Amino acid sequence: MCCEKWNHVAEMLLFIEDREEEYKILCLCSRAFVEDRKLYNLGLKGYYVKSSGNNAGDQGTEEEEDGHSNGTAESHSPNESDLDSEAKLMRSMGLPIQFGRMSSHENFEMSMNARNKAKVKQKRRKHQKRYLDEMVRESWRNDYEEDDLVVSDDPSSVEHCENNRTCEIQSKAGSEVENLPVENTLAPKLEVPENWEKYWNEYGEGLLWQSWQEKYPDQTLSSEPWNLPDTKEEWEQHYSQLYWYYLEQFQYWEAQGWTFTASQNCDKDVYTSHTEVDQNAESSLKADVMTFSSSPNIVEDEIPGSNDNDHNEIITAINNITVSAEKVEQSQLDSSQHCDEPLSEITGKECPASGGSDSCNGTPKENDISENRSSDQPAKELQESSGTNKGKHRPHHNGADGHESDDDPPEHKPSKVKRSHELDVDENPDSEVDDNGFLLGFKHGSGQKYGGIPNFSHRQVRYLEKNVKYKSKYLDLRKQMPVKSKHILFTEDSGKPFVVCKSKVRSKVEKFLKWVNERVDEETSQDSLSQNKMQDTCTSSDSEEQDMSLEKADNLMETRDPEPEKCQIISSATELEAEKSEVGSLVATVPENCSTEEIPNSPHAETEVEIKKKKKKNKNKKINDLPPEIASVPELAKYWAQRYRLFSRFDDGIKLDKEGWFSVTPEKIAEHIAGRVSQAFRCDVVVDAFCGVGGNTIQFALTGKRVIAIDIDPVKIDLARNNAEVYGIADKIEFICGDFLLLAPCLKADVVFLSPPWGGPDYATAETFDIRTMMSPDGFEIFRLSQKITNNIVYFLPRNADIDQVASLAGLGGQVEIEQNFLNNKLKTITAYFGDLIRRPALLKTSTSEAEV
């Protein structure tokens, strides 16, 4: 089947020199991802379990799991009548119906009932929490809509505002709590803070009694419902409802920064601007802005002339603010959307930091504002915006009244700057301009083009997928790593530069050898008597220290980079010889008695010998596991570990020759190509021009196609026939031993698959693979002959093939799709599709829409 992880990546336009744009070649770039890690791991372990067996095993386990959950109930349901008759018989005989424990059916029912109860409780908690949150939001939303004002400095108005609000909240809470079911009013497990206890001791009695009177207005005021037997239970229920309701509200508003000990000024400080100002000036601004009244009800109760005094105090407080113009302009973009709307909802004015003005009736004031805005600009705006007619605030968008104003200065309008990940390709063309397709991992060479097409003047790449650069980082595109910078010294004698590479490992080894030499010099500079004593009393500890020093040197030598650069390889031979000679000199300085007597008997030497023996045994085991034909050719050991990736039924009798190990297509990639061909259009006959051992031929036949397999080597034809018999589709394949160059004019088919030999594993060492000169036969010639059979051609090529040559196969003004085949996120091969096999983005959209309908 076709790979599920497939997508279009880009469109590449190749423009030809000295030709008009209409002759450009369109190259659609796509990627297909397949995985076969399981097959590779099985090859490393040395055994394989058939896919059919795996599927059967998986189905068996799934059936067992399903039977464990559902089969118990089903096993008892068909024999319920028998069980009932047996139970009656047992009961009539006086025998017990059950022994030891309950039946599995009852056990299952009890477990299901417990689960259902837990689910019901969980849903109840969620519903209760959601209901309370909605109730709180609705209550406060109505309060702000009905009471769009800010309290003045008058204490009486403050108390009046707070009392009205608390009464409304209590009445709403009482009416809403009545509707709650009894189960939801049970006391939840909440931590009771000390502040809540103080609050409840102070206000709880009044809240309870007020709500009770609203609930039962017919009762006398002198009655005590908590002592009467008729109303005692109702009072307890009423108490628990209000207690836990107000506790949750208290915790919610306390988390928002509200406290019952704070001044009752409706706490509008939450919506103040975040502009960086002096703390004293900011606090005075908050206090004055909070006292500014916009409600006609309160204005009527105030003393005449108080508005002018309040306005003057506000202006003087704002004038004390010292904010630089740069900070104000910088804060406009950051805090305009967070500051304008909340503060304007409270005061009916726009935030001073936003740089706009709003009159009391909601219409904008048009003012001439200079570029460098002074610090007293907000004061002027508030002074102009003062008035007697107070109206409800309308949302602020680009202008004060929600409409765009051409006279407003552009530097003060809120604007949104796109972030880097939101930029379009057209807006930032330099971000991912990739005319050579470097992000795609393509190779562009200077080889001869097909059909006499001259060189391409330039290329244009348009990416169809977002974040191609980011996604390509996690793919192994087999690119050459960039060479590190090196220090180049120019000698006076010759003009040729001398490259010097500094190795960290080399410097460490030099330091260690220098330290050892200094230590040896100190020991040799001692008196002759001490030297004789050392030779006479040489112990195993001395030899162990020297062994440790030698081991340290060996470890440093082993920690060299396993893949050094070329410059390191050139100088590594002489360096290693010098280092070995120095280490050898150290060994020579050790006294002979110690080296001949102590070291052989040391436990460290014994462990080294044992480790070497174990390594030899492991090597022998690995060699013995390989078949003789594989063990005789060391190059095939790598491919032997990948045998199940090449043929999943390898153990059923698959046969390969030496060249077949190198040239066969991995089964997952071959399966994907066959699936694409079968889904492209209705085709009956497929020609595999170079079938080899039958990797692609078998997959084409498995999709139900009639396959004509051609190869010039009779040995490969026999191997391909044997492998097809293993898969059970030999009757769908016609094997022909012959030269495709001679047989092509006589063939008729719907699709031609080309996978000529690439010249062995050495193809990967080339920077760019020339499909004309590095193939045998000529890659251009076999494509020309294939066009005589059909235009629907699949060309299977190495990953480093010259894309310009592949695109030239489409001809002037033609189209080609180049698909990158990723195996376990590693780029393995590329496949070029021609004719009706090309998947075009427009066709994909129409096909998906038709499938949805």
UniProtKB/Swiss-Prot annotation:
The modification Phosphotyrosine is found at Y144. The gene is Tgs1. The modification Phosphoserine is found at S81, S85, S92, S139, S152, S405, S431, S572. Residues 424-435 have a biased composition (Acidic residues). The keyword Ion transport does not apply. Residues 612-621 have a biased composition (Basic residues). The keyword Transcription regulation applies. It is found in: Cytoplasm; Nucleus, Cajal body; Nucleus, Nucleolus. This is Trimethylguanosine synthase. It catalyses: a 5'-end (N(7)-methyl 5'-triphosphoguanosine)-ribonucleoside in snRNA + S-adenosyl-L-methionine = a 5'-end (N(2),N(7)-dimethyl 5'-triphosphoguanosine)-ribonucleoside in snRNA + S-adenosyl-L-homocysteine + H(+); a 5'-end (N(7)-methyl 5'-triphosphoguanosine)-ribonucleoside in snoRNA + S-adenosyl-L-methionine = a 5'-end (N(2),N(7)-dimethyl 5'-triphosphoguanosine)-ribonucleoside in snoRNA + S-adenosyl-L-homocysteine + H(+); a 5'-end (N(2),N(7)-dimethyl 5'-triphosphoguanosine)-ribonucleoside in snRNA + S-adenosyl-L-methionine = a 5'-end (N(2),N(2),N(7)-trimethyl 5'-triphosphoguanosine)-ribonucleoside in snRNA + S-adenosyl-L-homocysteine + H(+); a 5'-end (N(2),N(7)-dimethyl 5'-triphosphoguanosine)-ribonucleoside in snoRNA + S-adenosyl-L-methionine = a 5'-end (N(2),N(2),N(7)-trimethyl 5'-triphosphoguanosine)-ribonucleoside in snoRNA + S-adenosyl-L-homocysteine + H(+). Residues 69-80, 526-541 have a biased composition (Polar residues). Residues 54-84, 328-437, 523-549, 594-623 are annotated as: Disordered. PANTHER family: S-ADENOSYLMETHIONINE-DEPENDENT METHYLTRANSFERASE RELATED, TRIMETHYLGUANOSINE SYNTHASE. GO terms for molecular function: RNA cap trimethylguanosine synthase activity. CDD domains: AdoMet_MTases. S-adenosyl-L-methionine binds at D711.
